[in-house]
Amino acid sequence: MAEITSAKATAKTVRVSPRKTRLVIDLIRGKRVADAIAILKFTPTKAAVEVENVLNSAIANAENNFGLEKANLVVSETFINEGPTMKRFRPRAKGSASPINKRTAHITVVVAEKE
């Protein structure tokens, strides 16, 4: 049986826009874990905080479940899927209303050992 060299973490229905979150994950894809955490710490967006939480969870999964070393890990795969959209309405002039879409995202981060 092959040895497991990667670990995954997912956050579902996170209240951040998928489009804005994709901009953040593009910054860390392929980087070493320590570098990725440093980048996310200094990225001043709500999406960066959420992605950092998922990344830390993936690192913990790698260490605790599979016995991988944190120093050898890289962010091998990250992707954002669109979650359910909450639809709301804002009252406007003359009895009309404008729609508001509160978007959510599913954030997935996979960390793997560097060969």
From Swiss-Prot:
Part of the 50S ribosomal subunit. InterPro entries: Ribosomal_uL22, Ribosomal_uL22_bac/chlpt-type, Ribosomal_uL22_bac/org-type, Ribosomal_uL22_CS, Ribosomal_uL22_sf. Keywords: Ribonucleoprotein, Ribosomal protein, RNA-binding, rRNA-binding. Belongs to the universal ribosomal protein uL22 family. GO terms for cellular component: cytosolic large ribosomal subunit. It comes from Lactococcus lactis subsp. cremoris (strain MG1363). PROSITE patterns: RIBOSOMAL_L22. The gene is rplV. NCBIfam families: rplV_bact. Pfam families: Ribosomal_L22. This is Large ribosomal subunit protein uL22. GO terms for biological process: translation. This protein binds specifically to 23S rRNA; its binding is stimulated by other ribosomal proteins, e.g. L4, L17, and L20. It is important during the early stages of 50S assembly. It makes multiple contacts with different domains of the 23S rRNA in the assembled 50S subunit and ribosome. The globular domain of the protein is located near the polypeptide exit tunnel on the outside of the subunit, while an extended beta-hairpin is found that lines the wall of the exit tunnel in the center of the 70S ribosome. GO terms for molecular function: rRNA binding; structural constituent of ribosome.
